[in-house]
């Protein structure tokens, strides 16, 4: 699964339909599709927004819809490209905690790309730092990256 910084939601579809789309393209039977969409909307805490359209949601809610769609097919790997880039610090923390829950509950490996040093420093997982395309740090137990590195 892939999560983008700018959400990439289908504006003419509801939250439910956006998440269902990922299952429809792989011909998931309708009863399984509805069940899985409800499961992931519960996981991302958007059950009450199922019939809302993306334009009616906050940035944090839109990112949670994008995450729900990305995990609908139970991928073993989720790539999150700047998932907090368009969010304020509080919403960023919520998204990071959600990704950690998905890692644990869905048993999904998550690769997150970010330029936000605070997100990296708050996240106690393996951290790989690149500079100009070169590996400059590989902190296998997580840890802090100073703003000067």
Could you describe each region identified by the protein language model?
Residues 32-44:
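ABC nucleotide-binding domain "signature" region
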Residues 13-20:
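Short coil-to-helix segment of the ABC ATPase nucleotide-binding domain corresponding to the Q-loop/switch region
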Residues 67:
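Hydrophobic anchor residue at the start of the ABC signature
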Residues 78-81:
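Catalytic Walker B motif of ABC-type/P-loop ATPase nucleotide-binding domains
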Residues 89-91:
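Helix N-cap at the start of a conserved alpha-helix in ABC-type nucleotide-binding domains
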Residues 74:
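Conserved catalytic motifs of ABC-family nucleotide-binding domains
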Residues 53-57, 61-63:
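Conserved ABC ATPase signature
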């Amino acid at each position: 699964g892939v999560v983008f910084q700018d959400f990439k939601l289908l504006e003419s579809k509801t939250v439910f339909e956006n998440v269902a789309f990922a299952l429809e393209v792989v011909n998931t039977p309708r009863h399984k599709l509805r069940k899985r969409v409800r499961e992931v909307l519960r996981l991302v805490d958007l059950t009450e927004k199922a019939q809302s359209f993306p334009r009616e949601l906050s940035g944090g809610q839109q990112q949670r819809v994008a995450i729900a769609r990305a995990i609908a097919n139970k991928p073993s790997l989720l790539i999150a490209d700047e998932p907090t880039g368009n969010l304020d610090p509080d919403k960023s923390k919520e998204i990071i905690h959600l990704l950690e829950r998905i890692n644990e509950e869905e048993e999904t490996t998550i690769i997150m790309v970010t330029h936000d040093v605070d997100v990296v420093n708050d996240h106690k997982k393996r951290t790989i730092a690149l500079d100009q395309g070169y590996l400059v740090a590989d902190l296998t137990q997580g840890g802090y990256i100073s703003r000067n590195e």
